[in-house]
Amino acid sequence: MERAEKREFVTELNEVFKASGSVVVAHYAGSTVAQMNDFRSKMRAAGGTVKVAKNRLAKIALQGTEAEGMSNLFKGQTLIAYSNDPITAPKVVMDFAKTNDKIVVLGGAMGTTTLNAEAVKSLATLPSLDELRAKLLGMIQTPATRIVGVVAAPASQLARVFAAYAKKDEAA
């Protein structure tokens, strides 16, 4: 890499660390190209990105960001997985690590909080923001449908009473 390319890469990585909802750092030593391509495609499908960076450049890019506390994670062959959704990157990394023992989660960051490997695992078990929104919307809609049912019930009961009187009058 030329010096200008390194500067550009550090600037790009710095923006990633500033703007991402969550960042996960993991070792990938021993993974095949096919496995890494599979991992990248799964992360892309979920809305995240995977980058492999030189540790020295990643540490420089971390300077001045909220995630600066995770600079000690960059030792050995490390990859950086990130997403705007705080849950996506940890979830995809942990799911992939279950089937591929070459991926070892070291930790990560979410905003100003530096996460260890256990915290990343815990974060991966949470539902995504879209799932939480769907649950919240369902909880909000449930009382409304019950109110509609309660309001509509007397009208339907009244209609049944009229129908019963009409049948009674016809029979008489």
Swiss-Prot record:
Gene3D superfamilies in alphabetical order: 3.30.70.1730, 6.10.250.290
The keyword RNA-binding appears for this protein = yes
Keywords per UniProt: Ribonucleoprotein, Ribosomal protein, RNA-binding, rRNA-binding
Membrane-crossing ranges are none
Q: Which cysteines are cross-linked by disulfides?
A: none
Question: Annotated Gene Ontology MF terms?
Answer: large ribosomal subunit rRNA binding
Give the CC-aspect GO terms.
Answer: ribonucleoprotein complex; ribosome
Entry function: Forms part of the ribosomal stalk, playing a central role in the interaction of the ribosome with GTP-bound translation factors.
Q: How does it assemble?
A: Part of the ribosomal stalk of the 50S ribosomal subunit. The N-terminus interacts with L11 and the large rRNA to form the base of the stalk. The C-terminus forms an elongated spine to which L12 dimers bind in a sequential fashion forming a multimeric L10(L12)X complex.
What name does UniProt use for this protein?
Large ribosomal subunit protein uL10
Q: Lineage of the native species? A: Bacteria, Pseudomonadati, Pseudomonadota, Alphaproteobacteria, Hyphomicrobiales
